[in-house]
Amino acid sequence: MKPRILALSLVSALVSIAGCRNDSAVDSTLFAVEVMDGVRYVHNFKAQRGERPGARLELLGKIGTLEAKENKDILYDPVDAARLPDGDILILERGGSCVKRYDENHRLISAFGQKGQGPGDFANPFCLRLDRGRDRLYVGHSRVSRFTPDGIYEGGFNREVFAAFGSIGAESETSGMSVLSGARVILPSPPSIWLDSGADKLLSVYDDKGTLIRSFGAVKRYDDPGLMLNANIVKFAADADDNAYVAYAYQNRIDKYSPEGGMIFSADRPLRYEVRNVTKVEIFKSGAMEREFSWPSVSSVTKGISLDRKNRIWVLTFLKQPNRFLTFDEAENWTECLEFEVFDADGILLFKVALPDVPFGNFSIYDDRLYLVDWRHESCVYEYRIVEDN
């Protein structure tokens, strides 16, 4: 039996979505909605504010500098940042295998962690998250480890290693982590549970002991396993009600899932380029020997996702295609390479926010602060205030 598809008129889309949002300012001509099996598919044509920005980023300062002579002013390969309720800033170092804590004036307060495999140690950490109360922090590395803000280790569990697919598998494995209520976490699912079957299980929820609770996340299918893994790498975040927001790194797709793992909406938006994910044959030479390899060729769409205090979805979108290292050359102006697209909790594109011209690899949002983490160039973290435009 074919899925039942209900195409909503723009007027009824406005009534159904804006009505539940208690927001009468939505222009229904700027998006369309269709409903299939209870899931809303939102097609954004333009941002609600057009080309007018809805916010700007005000630089408050920078933590870490290459020219520093004292250890307190140096960050060793920072990869993530978070903000505690009192304004203190936590920065996760991959190179230093530790978490450093700074006050709101960017002065170092304390640090904890070391490289190793023991309880509270880190091995190639990539992600730092706070729980809903922001009184527990979780570090993603070869394990998931839970700490108090003062660095007291409270427990954790081992992660399944993504052994196959080389750099693609590594990118998928370290694409993110989200913390839910009840000390549960969302992690990328091991390819073994979805890749061969094509089951919709991109992400998995685990309890505090590492027991799998459930898996969810729509998979776009391809014939080549490497391409299917690559094209389905996702960035994700969770709100205070345990809804999960999933942005596909190499697809024009942003999904919202209920706490039970049911899809609520799937949204897209206009891009400046065509999304084309294919398998290409490349020739590798070593001396007189030549070998042909099939390798995925994908279009970069989304670099990251986060939620602000108004439960809006900030998606970091590529304006142009990056180099093979997923970054841009030094001569590039980053303002012209990436931008933030801000959606409401129903998938409607509200406005866009221009990036400052600084290179970075990761970002996070807490309260009215946005952190840009640069591990490749300046080894620093930039702190910005999000200033709303009326």
Question: Residue ranges of each PLM-predicted region?
Answer:
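Eukaryotic scaffold repeat domains enriched in small/polar residues
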Residues: 20-390
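Bacterial N-terminal signal peptides that target proteins for export
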Residues: 1-7
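Bacterial N-terminal signal peptides
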Residues: 8-16
